[in-house]
């Protein structure tokens, strides 16, 4: 997961980069560091992630951090929420700048995965997904906390009924249907 000075990889910079290694459904190692963007962090970015200029002032720049990050992830599959439209674009930009080549790791984006597996959710932000699974959102929008939150959500989504298969009622086993209710859509059963 990345925290940045803004949403455009062309104009903005990474200010925090984190990853977790997972083996047998357990986090076995972590990588996390703040990054000095060598520019002022806009107020809007600090409002989202809480990272200030003072916090990054004595931290290494991306040229120092990126090789360490890539050594940590190696050729592993990267998993992130909105990784396709956000994180990978920053990683590709930095790799191109530093090495003249791109990051070639395969990756899984949990945002479209959540839309497919959990169509009943009104929103599919990482914090919404975590709330759906009753996972703590403490520290949200800090890179390491988001990595841990996303790993838990990913594991739980893998256990969801595959898209296209019928969801069954846990009480009676009948097939449930998506219904519209007073407070929005929900999955309901009339069999018990």
Language model: regions and residue ranges:
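Short functional micro-motifs and their immediate structural scaffolds
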Residues: 174-178
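Conserved non-catalytic scaffold segment of RNase H-like nuclease domains
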Residues: 2-92, 96-105, 119-141
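Cysteine-rich micro-motifs
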Residues: 182-192
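Acidic, divalent-metal-coordinating active-site segment for phosphoryl/phosphodiester hydrolysis
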Residues: 142-156
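A short, structured active-site edge motif that brings together acidic residues
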Residues: 104-115
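Short metal-coordination and nucleic-acid-contact micro-motifs, chiefly zinc-binding Cys/His arrays
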Residues: 162-168, 185
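Short cysteine-rich clusters marking metal-coordination/redox-active sites
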Residues: 169-172, 189
């Amino acid at each position: 997961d990345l925290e940045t000075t803004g949403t455009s990889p062309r104009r903005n910079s990474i200010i925090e980069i984190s990853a977790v290694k997972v083996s047998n459904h357990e986090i076995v190692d972590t990588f996390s560091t703040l990054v000095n963007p060598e520019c002022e962090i806009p107020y809007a970015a600090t409002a989202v992630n809480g990272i200030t200029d003072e916090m990054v002032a004595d931290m290494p720049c991306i040229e120092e951090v990126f090789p360490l990050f890539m050594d940590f992830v190696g050729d592993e599959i990267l998993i992130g929420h909105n990784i396709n439209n956000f994180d990978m674009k920053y990683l590709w930009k930095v790799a191109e700048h530093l090495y003249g080549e791109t990051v070639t790791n395969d990756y899984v984006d949990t945002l479209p995965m959540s839309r497919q597996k959990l169509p009943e959710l009104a929103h599919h932000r990482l914090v919404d997904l975590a709330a759906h699974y009753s996972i703590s959102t403490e520290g949200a929008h800090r890179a390491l906390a988001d990595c841990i939150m996303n790993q838990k959500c990913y594991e739980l989504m893998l256990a969801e009924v595959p898209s296209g298969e019928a969801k069954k009622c846990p009480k009676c086993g009948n097939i449930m249907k998506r219904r519209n209710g007073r407070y929005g859509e929900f999955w309901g059963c009339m069999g018990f």
